[in-house]
Amino acid sequence: MADIDQYCRVYDGFLSPSDCEEYIEKYEETLHVDNQKWKDLSVCIEKDGSKNPTCGGCNCDRLGPMEFERFNNLNQKLMKAWDGAVRKYIDDCQIVIPVQWPKEFGWEEFRIKRFKVNEEENHGLEDHVDVYSHAHAKRFLCLMVYLNDDFEDGETYFPIFESKVKPKQGRLFIFPPTWNYLHRGIPPRNPSGRGAKYFIMTHLNYIDLTNVNKGLDQTKRKAAAYDPNTKKMTKEQLSWPKS
């Protein structure tokens, strides 16, 4: 019988400490130097400044590093590393039957999230899955890299399996984002060197020929890039399901 370890994989040392630190430094620099551009391009913030309902109670300060030139070199290096990690994941999980894996697939744009320590409310999503609507059903794999570990707690927890993945700087965690992998982020706590937990992530998609999934450089973008599949959905349909 397969357990959580069959399709959930941890790869330590995936990103070097220096690359992790540089991502965090550039993230903070971007929020300071390009704060208005960050707000203008954010899918989490409405034009009136209110919270987008698709984010639920999340307060992750999400940032798209592909939209800012200072991340370009890091993103190219990360894309190459992620591509190799996916090939290793396929081998490690013994995915050998052709129908199990698409011949072509897309990568969602990278996103960095920051969760501040000791926030009991809005620290992140409670029990959830990353595929909860038709628009999200193109996702079939999640890749997440922990950029720091200088805090207590902050694990990724799977309640059904009663299993946790502990953040470790440079650690890559790969897992399916579907309904059967319910999970949540445990809030990070003090003592903490930076007062926050940072990670960078993406999803693999069944092929979707939209601009959202094309290329690493989105620095010329002038407005938030919403998934075309969501355009005809109401706010109620897009809202994060309440537990």
Residue ranges and their predicted role:
Residues M1-L172, N180-S243:
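Fe(II)/2-oxoglutarate oxygenase catalytic core
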